[in-house]
Amino acid sequence: CSLSLSIMVTIVVGLWAINELTYDNFYPDGDRMYRVVQNFELNGKSTRAATSFKPLGEIAKRELPSIEQMCRIVSRPMGVTFHNMVHFGVPSLVTDHNFFSFFGFSLKEGDIETAFSGTNNAIITESAARKYFPDENPIGQRIVSHGYDFFISGVMYDIPRNSHIRAEVIFPMFGHFKGWGWDSGFYFDTYFVLSSDADLKLIGERLAQINRTGLSNFLKDATNEVGLELVRDIHFSKTEPGFDSAVKGDKSFLQILVFTALVILVIGCINFTNLFISTAFIRARSIGIKKSQGAGRRTLILEFYKETAVYVFISVVGGLLLAMLTLPVFNNYTGSTTVLDFYNPQLYVFLFCLIIVTILIAGSFPAFRMTKFGIIETIGGKFRGKKMSAFQKALVIIQFTSSISLLIIVFFFGRQIDTLLSQDLGFDNKNVFYVNGWGAFGADYKSLRNELRKNPAIADVAMKQYDLPLRMGNGVGVCNLDGDEVMLIDL
């Protein structure tokens, strides 16, 4: 039982770690694909942003020959109308027409060459197709966002879970997304595929020059450095949350959980070894009899490993069943999307390595120690000497020390989580409900507010550009102060 529990923890944490470490490693030009990152320093505040102004990408593509491809993305939840019903907070992308060829995403339905070529074409994922069009073909269906009509021209395969890009609906550049220039719209994630001999430092300096030219005197009171980060490094990169829509990971948290899982696995293996030792008298007599019949030590060691392998295999099956029950809770806690995908060959490679490591840890001491004694010692029981007892005591001490250490760590983690959950947010969040998708209300907001206020269960209604104040925006505006135009960064 203890071995199954420790293996369950190792499986859950191991699959999650594999998912974290393989983020964005599947793009066709992943070794040459970069995203623009910028460092702004304004009024003593430093900000690292993964967003850019819309013109930066197109100018850079035109002027820098080492940039082979360029693609821009605005990622945000949007209000989208399906079948005359508005759905708020739909994960959406507004992007350039080369999005699919750039990232290598393919379509399940529709022609990849033409499906995203029009100005009013939209692509949805297969999960979105099942969600919004469960009993009909979504191709050709009309959807609406921000007052613009679109027609679904393709269904793409779901974006892999270990991608920093998340979306259900893909839109082309439209409306104000098209018109944004240097004076607004600091929302674009800009990606480049570079030539193999590209100089990253030189490109960063050239991008900063393009920024300074485009922003002219808006950057006179600010410093701006532009760099490039490999797309495969995005998941663990450090950027301001309001200026990066990518799903982020934490290497320190990853290392802590992996170390904890390994400690738990070792504890389970030690407990298993102690159980082997507790039946040592019976096993020793059996070893002595086999040796008297001509069995060699190597043969006996292999038998121990075979017996251990049977127990470990049963424990792995039990651990898998427990992992299936535990993963939803773990995902809710970590915010991950880890799944037990039995069609993924990585799962079987991981399980094979886990089984081998567990067999070696759990079975090595009984196999080598108990087969060391001679025929007379084992049959006569002389093997139960001081060395065996000392080693067993050491295992028990290690087991209890590790267990107590884990309990202390869990206690302090629990206290930290309780502290975070009990922090004063500056407002009362009880009985407060919000809808993410403010832009979809448009001019109808006042009418909607008046209708909602008629409901006796609703005390009041208000609108805010971003989520209830737990998330800030990412934008740049221009304001005229005392006759001077200055840049304001919405942090």
Where do the PLM segments sit?
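Short, strongly hydrophobic transmembrane alpha-helices
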Residues: C1-L21, D31, S389-Q416, F427
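Short juxtamembrane loops and helix-capping segments at transmembrane helix boundaries
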Residues: L21-G30, N39-E41, R166-F177, S237-S245, ...
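Mid-to-C-terminal secondary-structure elements
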Residues: T95-E109, N121-S252, S447-L491
